Every structure is written in C-alpha cells, then in structure tokens.
C-alpha cells in the first residue's frame, strides 16, 4: 500500500474546490483526506458531525478532537483543525501529502512538523470544477 494521501482544507463557503469535493456547507474549517485505501475522511467541528454523516460525500466523518495529538489541541479552532489533520495523517501512516493550491500554510506547518512531506498539485480541484456533474445540472 502507498503512503500518500490527498488533502484539501479550509472553509467550504470560500473554497469552492473543497465544497465540490464534499458537497457540504459548514462555517468552520473542514478537512477532506483521500487515503491510499480509496476511502475519504472528513474532519470538521463536532457539532456538524451528525449532519455531515447524513449529507457529506465522505466514507468516514470525525471531529477535530478525534485526532488529538499527544500535546493536545490548541484552544484556537483553526489551529486545532490543522493539528488534528496532521494527527489523522500520522495515525494512517502517511508520509507524503498531495495538496491543492488552497491548502492554508498552517496545515502545511503542522503536517511537516509531524514529519511528512507536502507536495503541491496545482490542478487538484481546478479541472473538476470546470466540468459540471449530474448534481450540478
């Protein structure tokens, strides 16, 4: 099995590529991780989990606190989201992350601090948005 995952993160209200990937709107940070086994993990604020399990395009839905690193999560929600992303990737044995061009620098910082490489895919999410699918027609 490969140890590469694809990651998109941010606010789906602003990040249209992220919204298109999960088709789920929230007001806080949402993280989608496509793991090497073909499953999609969505991490978001705990209050949104039940709704996301019903409506989001994801195989697994978790809250930020489900991936608390050994040093704990920051009290700042955006920082905690980035920390939980890195911890989820670490627990899944990921060594390399492919990210779209909108991945916030804070996520890159925590992912790299956890010992993983981050590579940019400039086209990730962009080409998908240029073609309408059946749900968008």
Question: Positions of the model-derived regions?
Answer:
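Terminal domain-start leader segments
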Residues: 1-91
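Flexible, acidic/His-enriched mid-domain "rim/lid" segments that flank
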Residues: 77-137
């Amino acid at each position: 099995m490969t140890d590469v995952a694809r990651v998109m993160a941010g606010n789906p209200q602003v990040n249209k590529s992220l919204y298109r990937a999960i088709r789920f709107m929230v007001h806080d940070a949402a993280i989608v991780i496509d793991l090497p086994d073909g499953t999609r993990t969505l991490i978001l604020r705990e209050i949104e989990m039940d709704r996301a399990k019903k409506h989001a395009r994801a195989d697994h839905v978790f809250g930020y606190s489900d991936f608390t690193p050994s040093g704990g999560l920051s009290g700042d929600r955006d920082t905690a989201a980035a920390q939980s992303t890195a911890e989820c990737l670490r627990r899944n044995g990921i060594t390399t992350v492919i990210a779209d061009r909108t991945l916030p620098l804070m996520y890159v910082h925590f992912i790299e601090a956890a010992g993983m490489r981050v590579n940019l895919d400039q086209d990730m999410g962009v080409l998908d948005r240029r073609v309408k699918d059946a749900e968008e027609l």
